[in-house]
């Protein structure tokens, strides 16, 4: 099972990924202002990683499990993890695209 990792530096001057859905932007607007940039940056990094690895052109819908962990609503997609430290965000994808 493959694990893919990407990291980036949080920078509000850098443009966001064009692969974020309108729903993702709406979810960010519901957060406190200080968390919005971090949320969008992590989702942008995740969207670009999905595009590079699987050719998925828009970030799929993300839901929260009962324990609060974010997952893709489509269970055929790999699991992911997002971590922050200071001004750095890291995204890991575990597994591969499952064929239904």
Label the model's feature ranges:
Residues 1-99:
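Core catalytic alpha/beta fold that binds nucleotide/phospho-ligands
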